[in-house]
Amino acid sequence: MDKRHDPSRRIIAPHGTQLSCKSWLTEAPMRMLMNNLHPDVAERPEDLVVYGGIGRAARDWDCYDKIIEVLQRLEDDETLLVQSGKPVGVFRTHADAPRVLIANSNLVPHWANWEHFNELDKLGLAMYGQMTAGSWIYIGTQGIVQGTYETFVSVAKQHFEGISKGKWILTGGLGGMGGAQTLAGTMAGFSVLACEVDETRIDFRLRTRYVDKKATSLDEALAMIEEANQAGKPVSVGLLANAADVFAELVKRGVTPDVVTDQTSAHDPLNGYLPQGWTMAEAAAMRKTDEAGVVKAAKASMAVQVQAMLDLQTAGAATLDYGNNIRQMAFEMGVENAFDFPGFVPAYIRPLFCEGIGPFRWVALSGDPEDIYKTDAKVKELIPDNPHLHNWLDMARERIAFQGLPARICWVGLKDRARLALAFNEMVKKGELSAPVVIGRDHLDSGSVASPNRETESMLDGSDAVSDWPLLNALLNTASGATWVSLHHGGGVGMGFSQHSGVVIVCDGTDAAAKRVGRVLWNDPATGVMRHADAGYEIAKNCAKEQGLDLPMQE
């Protein structure tokens, strides 16, 4: 019997102000763990899978139950340790220490590969935490929408003089991460054709308004895109098809999209990518009998897809890797020039990272959407001179359906995160919000990740693979008083290719919370500015000076 599978489970986080735990400092991680497994949030909640192939919230259902039990009895001077989704110890610390410390999927570098991890996973000794799955701060597809939107806006500026009208994006994948592309693309003014092999994912994106239309043939999908472009109104189409097949067919037909990318779960060739010509049922059966054969077939299909992306780039498409390591997989299968198209971070996002700007997010523990709308208004009040940000907040309210507990993503940087968080804490204190909020972020942030094929690709000083930085980030956030801190390996790009840390803090309206919030939400983005200044980026050096950071080697 698989202890990770229980179709009878239906997890819904409590709403309102009644506590199941001894304080909001422990109620918050409990609710956020449960929210990760909400049926509208998680991809396969019955298997504890939140997103990204096999990114889980807990190692198995026994571990999940025990985590909930411990959080409900945990005192405010105790800390729970979670090792790859398993609660392994409770220790006396102090009131300003984290209530939970999490380490997921970490392996000694020589053994940091999928083969070794999968053996440990089968034995029940490990859990793949992805980024926000195992760190209990996933907010559904909204969590990546703004970052994807910012990327597509930058693509329009760099390649099309800022004009996206009448242009379209080709991509693959409509899972927890990839599902953001269709909505973000249309928000940025592009039409989007997204290939997806799992029809239930397309239907889910239709229900939650991330996808406008569904197509079952390439001709039908292209006709929808053409009609929308002629009308001057962007449309998103979920095409039920294998991305490798579609990308190669477009090359064959001589049809060139304006932009090409991909967000299939290519980082995990065993569990995340369906080989060409295979059904999902066939792949599921083969995973039980011939893992090596599945991996080989998946990577061969990735090579076909990447070769098509290169061909489309040659034909004039703006082509980018969106951080799923598909170039690496194709390179390993003999596509020697797989890295000829850039990753999205060095091409479009790094200047933001240099100022500590990244995916700041918050969640209303009350479950009341009005709490999010009030905080949206507070952000506009405190940052009055940023029309781009205001436009994002307006579009988010109008077009993004909440999944589970109401939440908001908002890319802001060093100069704004702490003051926004302190304002939220004050709103809780004054009763303007009906319950506390939690503030966290993706591990994809400026100072919290080492990932040479994604966030730290092509660093100015060649320090792409140096992973001291996320370790320092996690240590500093722990020392600063975050409510829970996590340190993971392999998120986004797969085993052996990344290390990264996460942080979440509770704004419960107390003076003690204000002190913790002020430290954590200054120090956390400041490590990103520090990391980029150390690598030689002038934007980061200037930001550090302007914000008064004490960086000894920058004097």
Curated annotation (Swiss-Prot):
InterPro entries: Urocanase, Urocanase-like, Urocanase_C, Urocanase_central_sf, Urocanase_CS, Urocanase_N, Urocanase_Rossmann-like, Urocanase_sf. Its EC number is 4.2.1.49. Its cofactor is NAD(+). Keywords: Cytoplasm, Histidine metabolism, Lyase, NAD. It is an enzyme of class 4 (lyase). Coiled coil: none annotated. It comes from the Bacteria. NAD(+) binds at residues 52-53, 130, 176-178, 196, 201, 242-243, 263-267, 273-274, 322, 492. The active site is at C410. Binds 1 NAD(+) per subunit. GO terms for molecular function: urocanate hydratase activity. The keyword Cytoplasm applies. It catalyses: 4-imidazolone-5-propanoate = trans-urocanate + H2O. PANTHER family: UROCANATE HYDRATASE (PTHR12216:SF4). Catalyzes the conversion of urocanate to 4-imidazolone-5-propionate. This is Urocanate hydratase. It comes from Shewanella baltica (strain OS155 / ATCC BAA-1091).
